[in-house]
């Protein structure tokens, strides 16, 4: 597989509906996909929610219809496409894996059947539109399980049955077409957390998959050395290619406290455009340093967001656009040419 230099661009339909414009360094207004492709991005990740219309805060975005429209734009640009099933009507992450409203009253057997059918049918529909994903995630950051409470850890047996249902649904839809199945966990720099999950899951009968995907945010998930060692050990243990499918760093200090000064120190790089680019360069090089080209890419999580006055959260300082919608230097990291840095030396963190 070509080294994936990717971004999660799931917010684009919502931002475009709100009239947000993105600009190149010289102020030229550009289509977001044209802009990121210009600077080396060759893959786009999208999340899909089952029925976001059930959750007012979702705005109805990340539906199948939005996914299909975005997938067609991605393919028109000749880029690869990763689809991230959340198996929820809204956000799913280690702290919340809420079942879709339509699945709340299903028996466990019915829930497994729903996961299989929904995965198969969604991917089959995309395949019929000639936009079958290149990679599909069975759940989002499922280190604590998925579809709570049924698939919540420490019950590996039930969780694995649900994950297997998703894997089977994906395989059934793909048929003879090439589509890789990914398992995605957070805590990318915490080897023992991840080893515990994989060992427990395989012992419970986890079926074969193709890729390991990690979330790695340097202010939350360990040092860059931790990331390198974790990825290397996971490759040794499980013989699977690996990607960092979520990463990011701040380009300015947070007024509203999303990333505070202590977290900035933990990350080891300043919350500046230069610091943001340094982090991305380093993550890319760590992934490329994996043996036998088993490090296969990285994705920035939601870079296309424009901060608004008085608004906190991710858009305040974590995207790759400034308050005018102009692209920041971090995007230049995606012009990266992967080389196998077998003896990569990592920098000392800031004190």
List each model region and its residues.
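Conserved, mostly hydrophobic/aromatic
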Residues: 7, 84, 136, 212, ...
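Surface-exposed, active-site-proximal loop segments in enzymatic domains
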Residues: 17-21, 50-67, 89-112, 142-153, ...
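Short, acidic/polar
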Residues: 22-36, 119-122, 191-201, 283
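Aromatic-lined substrate-binding rim segments of carbohydrate-active enzymes
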Residues: 31-39, 45-90, 156-173, 231, ...
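Glycoside hydrolase catalytic-domain groove-lining segments
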Residues: 32-33, 196, 200-264, 285
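Active-site cleft segment of glycoside hydrolase catalytic domains centered on the general acid/base Glu
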Residues: 64-65, 94-199, 222-229, 310, ...
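Substrate-binding cleft of secreted/luminal carbohydrate-active enzymes
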Residues: 245-247, 266-338
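Conserved small/polar residues in nucleotide/adenosyl-binding loops
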Residues: 341-348
């Amino acid at each position: 597989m070509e080294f994936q230099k990717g971004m999660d661009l799931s917010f684009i339909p919502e931002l475009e509906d709100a009239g947000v414009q993105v600009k190149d360094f010289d102020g030229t207004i550009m289509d977001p996909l044209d802009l990121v492709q210009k600077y080396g991005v060759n893959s786009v990740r999208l999340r899909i929610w089952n029925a976001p219309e059930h959750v007012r805060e979702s705005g109805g975005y990340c539906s199948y219809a939005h996914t299909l429209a975005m997938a067609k734009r991605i393919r028109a640009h000749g880029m690869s496409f990763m689809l991230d099933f959340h198996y929820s009507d809204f956000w799913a992450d280690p702290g919340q894996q809420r079942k879709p409203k339509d699945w709340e009253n299903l028996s466990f057997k019915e829930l497994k059947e729903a996961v299989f059918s929904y995965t198969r049918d969604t991917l089959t529909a995309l395949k019929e539109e000639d936009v079958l994903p290149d990679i599909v995630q069975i759940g989002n950051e499922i280190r604590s399980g998925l579809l709570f409470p049924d698939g919540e850890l420490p019950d590996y047996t039930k969780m694995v049955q649900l994950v297997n249902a998703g894997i089977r649904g994906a395989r059934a839809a793909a048929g003879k077409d090439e589509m890789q199945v990914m398992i995605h966990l957070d805590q990318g720099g915490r080897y023992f957390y991840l080893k515990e999950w994989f060992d427990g899951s395989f012992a419970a009968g986890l079926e074969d998959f193709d890729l390991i995907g990690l979330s790695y945010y340097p202010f939350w998930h360990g040092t860059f050395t931790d990331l390198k060692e974790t990825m290397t050990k996971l490759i040794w243990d499980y013989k699977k290619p690996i990607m960092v499918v979520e990463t990011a760093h701040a380009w300015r200090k947070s007024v509203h406290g999303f990333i505070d000064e202590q977290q900035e120190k933990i990350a080891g790089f300043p919350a500046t455009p230069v610091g943001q680019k340094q982090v991305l360069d380093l993550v890319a090089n760590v992934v490329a340093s994996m043996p036998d080209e088993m490090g296969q890419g990285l994705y920035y999580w939601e870079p296309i967001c424009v901060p608004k006055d008085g608004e906190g959260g991710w858009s305040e300082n974590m995207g790759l656009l400034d308050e005018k919608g102009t692209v920041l230097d971090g995007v230049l990291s995606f012009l990266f040419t992967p080389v196998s840095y077998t003896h990569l030396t990592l920098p000392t963190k800031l004190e």
